[in-house]
Amino acid sequence: MRKHRNSNVVRLWAAGQAACSHTNNLYSMEDGSLWSYNLKIGQRTPAGVCVVADYMAPYFQSQTTSCHVSRAKGYADMVMNPLVWETSPMSEKGNL
């Protein structure tokens, strides 16, 4: 897979395409999921709705993940509180 800048990874995710950053720390998959390291931070539904978990303060994971979330929020149709996200089927690996 071709490597992309983080800004392009989230843009391609929102467009429904798989993509990976040059460090492999931010990536989107063909199932519509968006990952920061091993943490699922977003899901694009089959209808094309982009949902992002707001893993920023006070639900901070890492500085890098906060940067990834910040970029993804620019393309999000919905931003979820991480407590809601974690109980949602969208947060599960391989879902949707």
Show which residues each predicted segment covers.
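Terminal leader/tail segments of proteins
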Residues: 1-96
